[in-house]
Amino acid sequence: MTMTDTASETKPFQAEVAELLNLMVHSVYSETDIFLRELISNASDALDKLRYESIAKPELMEKGGEPKIRIIPKKAPDTLTIVDNGIGMDRQELIDNLGTIAKSGTKSFISKLAETKDSAGLIGQFGVGFYAAFMVADKITVTSRRAGSDDVWTWTSAGGAGFEIAPASEEAAARVERGTEIVLHLKPDASKYLEDWQIERIVTEYSDNIQFPILLMPEEGEPRQINSASALWQRSKSELSEDDYKQAYKQIAGAFDDPAMTLHYRAEGRQSYAVLLFAPSTKPFDLFEPERKGKIKLYVRRVFITSEAELLPPYLRFLRGVIDSEDLPLNLSREMLQKNPQLAQIRTAVTGKVISELESLADKKPEDFTKIWDAFGPVLKEGLYEDFERREKLLSLARFTTTAGEKRSLKQYVEAMKENQTEIYYLVGDSLERLKSNPKLESATARGIEVLLLTDPVDAFWTSGQLDFGGKPLKSLSQGDVNFDLIPKLEQDQDKDNKDEAKVDEATVIAVIKDALGERVSDVKASQRLTSSASCLVAGGMGPDRELEKLLARANKGAGSKPILEINLQHPLVAALGDTKTDKAEAADLAFLLLEQAQILDGELPEDPAAFASRLNRLVLRGVVAHG
């Protein structure tokens, strides 16, 4: 050891930790039971790590006894001690693990915790469970010995601005042969956690399926095990109740909601493995982090290996659970995980099983499936873009809001298609309200044609894949030409059509607009989409849809392909362009107005807002609209 290593030292908390501790210390939350669940979960993780590291280094298990977790209540003074004989921590690990939070999303957690009283769910989601102990303790002492080390360190904090790290006393070092001892000096109003029955109640509710024995060491009476310590996923489905699965989900996922779907089965044959997966009923906070990492835990013969094995494709990353293999080697390295053919086979098989389970749920319990889709549909739709092999199945699972005002499957959409309708129409945008008022819907609405309204960011990407469903291609209403000639308008719209019909020289009007706008648009066309609006912007028939064009243009800071301006020849503004009384300056103003109002309706600002305002003022003052 160096001089610094042997000396007692006081260190400040990382800023986020200090803020988090302030919330915990002054907490008014009612779900304080969770502190014990979180500490037991951490102890279980430490035992898992020891078991894994001891595969390569058996000597790590020589001191400290069989893996277990002990809970020791003690009155006068009121302390609750949680002890594990797991991997333990050295000095730097104590500083890193208890003095800082490296996990992304911490600031988001703190802001959410300050806003809500659902501390239980948030603490479980964000993985900052150790600090929950400050809800019940005004001081915490952690003594730890790293497996295989002679050095023992003590970390102490009263939840203020910092903590003290020092070599452990001889007495404390003698108590901790291996692993970690956490002593909570309880607040006066937390003394109930010294009652044996309270401890048993919490362990039974939250931690019964922890794989290691949890021993209660009462002040009076003999120590006793208070959890079942069984790997629930290895048990038969017939032995388990719905409550068993709910408890297992909460323990495995660190969650407080109930699972929306449970998949439990055992595969036998060329490979043997057990699978227990859950779909949450609420969105995890990190669902859309750029890494798109899954949270499935890989075990080999009940030995925890990793939760970073990419056991499912990214579009199923919302699932939580366990896969326990009988055949994989225990010494899997990170590199081997990426290349192991057995693991790849497990991934393929389990992914297929998950899709089948979702199909079954959609068929037999549509309301339950809709809840999953509402929470995780944007993630599942990533598979439409990435998983060509399962695209058809994922399309069948997809549920879409439509102009009919309800969530529908593509099968339901196709069954309701109009006579002579050969395509499935959709429109992509960033807001349902804006889409519903989009002028590109007008001609379809006039014919009673249903249109899918897509508002998730991923929609602009997966729809670019030239997809079809049941032989019916998906067609964007903001790309290429549309032809509704074989589908008659509804009666009221036919009457309106006859009244609004106007005679305009198409070629003349288009030439005037092109001359005014120049290269600001790629083309000007008469529209088959519009019935009441004057203009709209669309993309060409080849390449990206209009919404994807806009996304790509923003990503390239303005560089992108030019849109096509479509005009409604029956609209008075357009008719005014063909009027011989309209001079060239007025015609240019009108042409720009057609472009700029189309941009606004498309969710964009005009290129020059000041010029747009001046132009609009001029037209209003001149009363040009009256020319129509």
Swiss-Prot record:
Which parts of the sequence are annotated with region: B? 335-550
Give the domain of life: Bacteria
Query: What cellular-component terms does GO give this entry?
Result: cytoplasm
Q: Does the keyword Hydrolase apply?
A: no
CDD domains (UniProt xref): HATPase_Hsp90-like
Q: Name one Pfam family in it.
A: HATPase_c_3
Task: List every stretch annotated A.
Answer: 1-334
Key words, A-Z: ATP-binding, Chaperone, Cytoplasm, Nucleotide-binding, Stress response
Per its UniProt record, what InterPro entries does this chain match?
HATPase_C_sf, HSP90_C, Hsp90_fam, Hsp90_N, Ribosomal_Su5_D2-typ_SF
Query: Coiled-coil stretches, from where to where?
Result: none
**What SUPFAM superfamilies does this protein's entry cite?**
ATPase domain of HSP90 chaperone/DNA topoisomerase II/histidine kinase, HSP90 C-terminal domain, Ribosomal protein S5 domain 2-like
Keyword Aminoacyl-tRNA synthetase found: no
GO molecular function annotations of the record: ATP binding; ATP hydrolysis activity; ATP-dependent protein folding chaperone; unfolded protein binding
Where in or outside the cell is it found? Answer: Cytoplasm
Q: Where is this region: C?
A: 551-628
Q: What does this protein do?
A: Molecular chaperone. Has ATPase activity.
Describe its partners and assembly state. Homodimer.
Q: Which family does it belong to?
A: Belongs to the heat shock protein 90 family.
Protein name per UniProt:
Chaperone protein HtpG
Q: Which gene encodes it?
A: htpG
